[in-house]
Amino acid sequence: YITSYCFNDENCKKQLVSGRNVLFRSGDEFAILPHRIRLKLTDHNKQKLLALREFDVVEFYDHNLFDIFYQNSSNDNTLVITNQCNSNCIMCPCSSWFRKRQACETTEHLCNLVKYIPQGAPHLTITGGEPTLHKEGLFDVFDSIRENLPDTECLILTNGRTLSNVPYFESLINHLPPKTLFGIPLYGPNASIHDSITQSNGSFFQTVQGLHNLQQKGIPFELRFVETSINSMSFLETCVFIAQNFPKTTVVNIIALELTGSAYENRNKVWIPYEKAFQNSRNGIKYLIKSGINVSFYNFPLCKVDRSYWQLCSKSITDYKIRYAEDCKDCELKTICGGVFSSTLLATKMKLIPPKRI
C-alpha cells in the first residue's frame, strides 16, 4: 500500500475522498485506511513513523516492512526509476551486481507514487541507475508530474547518453515537467579519460551530443565532475572544454567520492584525498568563474577546503549517510559543515582537523 500520513481527521477525510490510502495516526497507534488494517509495529518502527509530518508518503509491504518515500521536511526526495545503468562507472557508489539485478519499476507504480506527493512540493529528484532506460514509460511518469506537480522543480539525473538519440530526445522533451533541470556527469575533456571512468566505449561522444541537444533547445542543465585519482589532474582542461562548448551550463558541481559499491571495490584506483582533490581543482574553478559559470563543491567537509572557497561548499550528503569524526566533536563550524560519508570515513580513516571560526 502507498499511503499518505495523516493525524488530522479532516485531512484524513480529504485524502480518502480523493481516492488515496491513508496511514492514520491516533495517539501512538497506526492504521491503513480505508482498509482498516491496524499495524503491529516494533517500537523502533513506531518511533520512525511518529517522527513523520502530515502528508509524508509511506509505502508498506508488510506491518514492519515499509519505505518512507517522501518527507516534507527533506530537501532530498527522490523518485528512483531503476537501478540499472548503461554505463559501468568505476567509482559508482552502487555495486555492479546491484545495478544488474534491479529491474525498472513499473510505470503504473511510479505514477501512483507521484500522485501521493503533496501538491506544492518544492523539489523532486528523478534518478536511477539511468532513468531513460525506462524508455517511453518515463514519458508517462513525466506526464504524471506535469499533471499533479506543475510547480515542483525537477532535477533529472542522467548520464545523458540516451539524449544523443534524436528521435527519443525529441519525444522526451515534449513530456518534460515545466521546471526541469538536467544533472549530467562529465568526467573529463576527452573520450580517453571519460570512457575510462564509465568503462563504456563511446559514452563521451554520446554524452557530449546529448548536452549539445539540450543546449540547442534551451533546456537548462548542470554538469557533475566526480573527482577521482584518474581524472583529477585533468580538471582544468575539462573546465576549458565546458566553457568553450557548453557556456550555458548553470553550474559545475565538483563531487567527492562516496566509497561504497564499485567505488570501494576500486578504491586503490580511484581514491584521492579530499585536500588533494581540492588543490587540483583550484585553477579550474577560477577559469569557470571567469567564464561566468557557477561552481559548487559536493561532499567536501569544510576542513578540507580553503576558507576562501567555503561559500562554494554545499551540504549535499543525505542525512542518514552523514558522519563526523571524533575530531569534529568540538568543531565550532559543525552546524554549517556537510560532514563526510560514513562509508568514506570508515574506509579511509581520514584525519579531520576542525578549523576555527573567525
Language-model features and meaning:
Residues 1-24:
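Short Lys/Arg-enriched alpha/beta "domain-start" segment
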Residues 27-78, 96, 308-315:
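N-terminal [4Fe-4S]-dependent radical SAM core
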Residues 69-108:
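Canonical Radical SAM [4Fe-4S] cluster-binding loop centered on the CxxxCxxC motif
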Residues 93-106, 119-134, 146-165, 176-208, ...:
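Core AdoMet radical
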Residues 112-131, 352-358:
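Short Fe-S-cluster ligation motifs
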Residues 124, 179-183, 205-268, 276-302:
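Conserved C-terminal portion of the radical SAM core fold
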Residues 136-143, 164-174, 233-241:
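Distinct, well-ordered alpha-helical segments
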Residues 306-358:
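Flexible mid-to-C-terminal extensions adjoining Fe-S/redox cofactors in radical SAM and related proteins
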